[in-house]
Amino acid sequence: MQRTNVIRLLLMPIAFALSATMASAQKPASVFIVAGQSNAEGRASTKECPHYLAKGYKHLKYAFVRTEQNGRFGHFSLGKTFAFCDVVNHFIDQKATTDFYVVKCAFGGTAITPAQTEAGKPIWYADSTWLAQNKPHNSTNGGMSLALSLTQGFEKCAEKTLSKLKEGYDVKAVLWHQGESDRSKPQQYYDNFKQLINFVRKEVYAVTGKEKDKRLPFIIGTVPRASRQYNPMIEEAQRKLGKELPNVHVVDLSDVSLQADVLHFDGKGTEVVGKRMLEKLVELGLADASADATPNTKACEAR
């Protein structure tokens, strides 16, 4: 009897370790959505990017659903420019032990409110009557709706890939940066952005069936105040949404540095935005990652 008890005591740590490993393996895959206009798409030169981004990603699976909505994820590598989400993804990737998924839909110079940009440019408008009369934007068929590009792109990703994951998947948040192109009619921004947030949440919930996705976290970055396209009424509307809608969180980017065009984040600014967005994800318990808040300026200069 004593020998049996000793064996049981010796085996207990092994059993706990195995159960912890199995629990980790069964944890749903994290999915992050990134959307907005040019500063979400990424305009900083990779010549200015922090050196750690050159290492690439081990666990990131990436789908850019603006150009096509085929439901396929692939590997991601930097091109001539980089975006704040590339920084976010790096630090999530560093802590990850399994694959995570990013669905991105961003297009430079795009507004939410109609008739704010040149004719033929797609918009983020989410009015139900307008959506019923328009198609999702993509590289093949044109189309005017970016809201449909995002939501139908996500639906395809779920159908073709995410729903087939043995461990399942969990949509963590939408990371959003936009507002410059709505500066001319800021009085309409609050209602139209609120409508868009509700639409995206409704469509994600329709796919996942998870009650929590009716309140899917929206993390909004403000427009830097030095931007030549800054309008305080846009920021006011974003902050009002952060107070009035559940699970909408505003990240203050008022002091972020810009390129010579006084519009787009420079390399340092892009890294700062990425780290602030990551910090909010971690604060909300939506990501397991950490990063030094100080911009990696030496690395940027040395690259």
Predicted regions and their residues:
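Bacterial N-terminal signal peptides that target proteins for export
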Residues: 1-11
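Bacterial N-terminal signal peptides
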Residues: 9-20
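Sec/Tat signal peptide C-region and signal peptidase I cleavage site
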Residues: 21-25
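Cell-envelope and extracellular/periplasmic
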Residues: 26-303
